[in-house]
Amino acid sequence: MHFFQSSLVAATMGAALVAAAPAADLETRGSCTFTSTSALKSGKASCSTITLQNIAVPAGETLDLTGLKAGTTVVFDGTTTFGYKEWEGPLISASGTSITIKQNPGAKIDCDGARWWDGKGGNGGKKKPKFFSAHKLNKSNITGLKVYNTPVHGFSIQSDHLTIKDVLLDNSAGTKLGHNTDAFDVGSSTYITIDGATVYNQDDCLAVNSGEHITFTNGYCNGGHGLSIGSVGGRSNNVVNDVTISNSQVINSQNGARIKTVYGATGSVTGVKFQDISLKGITKYGIVVQQDYENGKPTGKPTNGVKVSDITFEKVTGTVTSSATDIYILCGSGSCTNWTWSGNSVTGGKKSSSCKNVPAGASC
């Protein structure tokens, strides 16, 4: 048995030391329980199962789960908390191959984002740490985490063959001052599956900026900006291909199903499917495709450098508020092609008079 503490690393046997184990971080036959970030950092490399027990992450530090040996299982236990500092984060970072990240019953990750929320998100005010960096977390699984009140962005995903299942991200306390609390931002990734997510937030529930073979299904999105592709363009990777967003609900959000591309940029959005999406209480657009984003804002002037082709909107149904627009399609000349439009019904709002270059078969 090994006991990891900031001032002691000992290997010994005896009943007296065994009795002291609850106060220490214990590793036995590859199973390790850590109660501090310093112990985790020094001991994680030798562990096949890591339990994180009531860890209080010091201000300005990352809970470092990078470089784990292949096949490691990480288990959050109790309540994980974070000290306050204005910095970029992330609060948690994980990488490795064939990693499983999960939690014990009753556990939660409480970011206490209200300490940072000022209504400005990432656009000014306090510098806010992002929550979870899942970069190079390949052939891995994140399952059942319950996350509360991220200061700003939630999961940043740049990985291959990563499955995220039954995750709760609850920023409902940030309705007034939370901003840019995106749940899942996906970029430069392949074979990503997000299944059964429950999200309460103030920005995109899902944003796919680049990547291929991505699935978001059985999701519930409340209070944010909806299910989004983009903005696509202006990055090092400007290709989105083979994305299926299905069997999901979008409630009390700005947008329902959205594709947005950057003004004057190049790239491609192909093989994207929105299927069986239920909308309720949408305040801006039920279905929206815009090719006019510049500096994060629409210009009303679409360009055609990003091709938006082989797109399916199927059974996107529900209601928007009376001040919202049911459907808005603003494409560049010749850039939106080969769309499938079937069984869509968005009602309750206004009909747009500003649609341009609507592809054959679609309605606006």
From Swiss-Prot:
Annotated GO biological processes are: cell wall organization; pectin catabolic process
Matches recorded under InterPro entries: Glyco_hydro_28, Glycosyl_hydrlase_28, PbH1, Pectin_lyas_fold, Pectin_lyase_fold/virulence
Q: Where are the PbH1 repeats?
A: 159-188, 189-210, 211-231, 240-261, 269-291, 303-324
Instruction: Look up the domain of life of the source.
Output: Eukaryota
Q: Name one GO molecular function term.
A: polygalacturonase activity
- EC code(s) of this entry: 3.2.1.15
State its location(s).
Answer: Secreted
Task: Write the signal peptide boundaries.
Answer: 1-20
- Can you tell me which residues the record assigns to a coiled coil? none
| Location of the active site | D203, H225
Which residues are sugar-modified? N138, N141, N338
Q: What is the catalytic activity of this protein?
A: (1,4-alpha-D-galacturonosyl)n+m + H2O = (1,4-alpha-D-galacturonosyl)n + (1,4-alpha-D-galacturonosyl)m
**UniProt cross-references to SUPFAM superfamilies, sorted A to Z:** Pectin lyase-like
Propeptide stretch(es), residue numbers: 21-29
GO cellular-component term (any): extracellular region
Which cysteines in this chain are paired by disulphide bridges? C32-C47, C205-C221, C331-C336, C355-C364
SMART domains, per the entry: PbH1
Keyword set, alphabetical order = Cell wall biogenesis/degradation, Disulfide bond, Glycoprotein, Glycosidase, Hydrolase, Repeat, Secreted, Signal, Zymogen
Keyword tRNA-binding included in the entry's annotation: no
* Functional description taken from the UniProt entry: Involved in maceration and soft-rotting of plant tissue. Hydrolyzes the 1,4-alpha glycosidic bonds of de-esterified pectate in the smooth region of the plant cell wall.
The family annotation for this protein states: Belongs to the glycosyl hydrolase 28 family.
- This protein is called what? Probable endopolygalacturonase B
